[in-house]
Amino acid sequence: MRLKQGSFLWYLYLDKIYCLLSVRNVKALAEYFHILDVHGKNTLNDVLFYHFLHHVTDLKKAQINIVFDMLDWNAVGEIDFEKFYMLVCMLLAHQNHLEGQFMYRHSRPVFDLLDLKGDLRIGAKNFEMYRFLFNIQKQELKDLFRDFDITGDNRLNYQEFKLYTIIYTDKLQKRQKTEEKEKGERKRSLYSKCHIK
């Protein structure tokens, strides 16, 4: 999933630590939401939502419908600004490769969104449906349920999910540090080769 270059969301800045927008960006996003809300009900229905996501992302229609159903958990056929804001932060986190950080910082709201039945557990099938939002590969998903399903019921409760987000974020940070270190070593090596000649 990618944001389309030049769309409104492309110009918003997501804080890399907390995965939130600045007050100025939230104000601009609220204004954008009110422009999209042609019915003046402070909500977006499924048609408006589809056209918005189709305009700003490369998601397919089925994926957009899945996302709408996830956000419209009480099945009223509309989403309000709070859910819209969460979606935009999710999209920006995905665009900036901060999916793990987003899940860690917002573990409770993410868990509640993925808990479709409201029974305080996330099944593998539910997570599979939404893994494209968080850039989780199939093997990672299998490993997640194998390693963190402590109760053994093939469903994650909130504590298991939170533990996963902590360890996942830690792994990502270690991987990024290793990549930065290797990149620095390559630059030093290239620099020294240039100066030897």
UniProtKB/Swiss-Prot annotation:
Domain of life of the source: Eukaryota
A single BP term in Gene Ontology: spermatogenesis
Protein name: EF-hand calcium-binding domain-containing protein 9
Region (Disordered): 177-197
Stated role: Auxiliary component of the CatSper complex, a complex involved in sperm cell hyperactivation. pH-dependent Ca(2+) sensor required to activate the CatSper channel. Sperm cell hyperactivation is needed for sperm motility which is essential late in the preparation of sperm for fertilization. Associates with the CatSper complex via direct interaction with CATSPERZ, and senses intracellular Ca(2+). Together with CATSPERZ, associates with the CatSper channel pore and is required for the two-row structure of each single CatSper channel.
Biased composition (Basic and acidic residues): 177-188
SUBUNIT field: Component of the CatSper complex or CatSpermasome composed of the core pore-forming members CATSPER1, CATSPER2, CATSPER3 and CATSPER4 as well as auxiliary members CATSPERB, CATSPERG, CATSPERD, CATSPERE, CATSPERZ, C2CD6/CATSPERT, TMEM249, TMEM262 and EFCAB9. HSPA1 may be an additional auxiliary complex member. The core complex members CATSPER1, CATSPER2, CATSPER3 and CATSPER4 form a heterotetrameric channel.
Compartment list: Cytoplasm; Cell projection, Cilium, Flagellum
Residue numbers binding Ca(2+) 2: D149, D153, R155, E160
Keyword list, A-Z: Calcium, Cell projection, Cilium, Cytoplasm, Flagellum, Metal-binding, Repeat
Binding site for Ca(2+) 1: D58, D69
GO molecular function annotations of the record: calcium ion binding; calcium ion sensor activity
InterPro entries: EF-hand-dom_pair, EF_hand_dom, EFCAB9
Pfam families: EF-hand_7 (PF13499)
EF-hand domain mapped to chain residues: 59-94, 100-135, 136-171
